[in-house]
């Protein structure tokens, strides 16, 4: 016997339609590429998203066509999120931090028909345009007054296109499993792979993001996503914002400490999200200038492991709660979030920080397990470690244009490539990427554990640990650090810092001090580059 409930399709257009009806006067504030602060409402966003859909239709874009964006977090970008997907095309966000050769590969692999770009990235687009096989037009996301001169013949002005359209476009109704957006993995080992999200998966993920135990979005909150809209759809937050009526503040290209602090204070931001590298810079700015953001209550940190020193700094120095999140492009991306249980909030600082450096508990909708090398499920005792596998309604089952290649195991689990433990309370803790584990004398050494310890040294800004060949032990850990301004510790001081904190045999044999660590397009240290230099 089946239930007697209506069967309504879960479509991205329904999110902004809801936001415009229920929270019509809620604000969206953007720092623009052109400079000024821009303000408008959810109702304005809905109307202009319909104009985008009308403009795309007039340009000949059809259902399933891919439309690429190369843009910062801003109001025009979010209009494309809803306008492109709402008219049944696929919104394909591009990461401008990737190497031009990777962008060329991605655009050609996706067969994008149009490319929307912020003014910032027009020189990059001009440099690669001649190698793009399917792009018919390039739209600059600005108005006529700011349109630049360009050698490109197929250049269009965003605001001119919208001015030719009314806001009476009717959102079509279609299958919720239709493709909505496309993101490519960073491709550190080979070409990037496309992850194709559906309307259904995106809406379900938005429900998850909005939960009190995840990002706690609501009409009483003001949220600023530092995480880019070109990185896994800004962790799904643009879809959750109109669902919940949360005020949205977008930083545009200005991600330095001064700009973020000024904007957060001006708009009374209560929560934010981003990668550790951004927060490291922000913390240093606050300390150097004796400032902060008094309204900020919570920061969601993901993308790479959060150093214990960062959790402690936000808490003790500024009274801000850190919630570590974990996920991956193939998971839309959120899989777990670390929100303390009520009884843990009153625990001593040391105990709380021990918990907060873990990646957290699975969100509803995501199942997790760890397995050994033979695929046998391991116990959730906080000690056994194995490969982390996941499954759920917003987890990818295949890569774009590679549908025939097996990704899932025989029971439908996705292999993450992470090594983790899970304890009895469900807290998952990633000990390393499988490819980053160091095997020394038959024993495994976690590079993440050593990196987090190094980051707690008062002189260290960033740290990475890689395995380098060793005749006796097969591999030994090498510590590579970027120091804070003015710091000059000795090698002995840095290596001695590990004494008593980890087993002696896992302490790195040497340390290299560098001006900069190689950072990839998603804000993570590129260990493949470090291995080329030192291993």
Segments (PLM) and residue ranges:
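Structural core segment of the AMP-binding/adenylate-forming
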Residues: 15-17, 58-59, 86-160, 174, ...
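Conserved AMP-binding/adenylate-forming core of the ANL superfamily
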Residues: 28-74, 78-82, 99-104, 154-160
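Conserved adenylate-forming
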Residues: 56-61, 166-178, 182-224, 236, ...
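A short helix-loop-beta submotif of the ANL/AMP-binding
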Residues: 66, 72-92, 96-100, 108-114, ...
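AMP-binding/adenylate-forming catalytic core of the ANL superfamily
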Residues: 98, 104, 115-117, 272, ...
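Conserved AMP-binding/adenylation subdomain of ANL enzymes
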Residues: 203-222, 232-270, 285
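Gly/Ser/Thr-rich phosphate-binding loop
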Residues: 243, 266-274, 283-354, 367, ...
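Conserved beta-loop-beta connector loops within the AMP-binding
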Residues: 362-389, 424-425, 487-491, 526
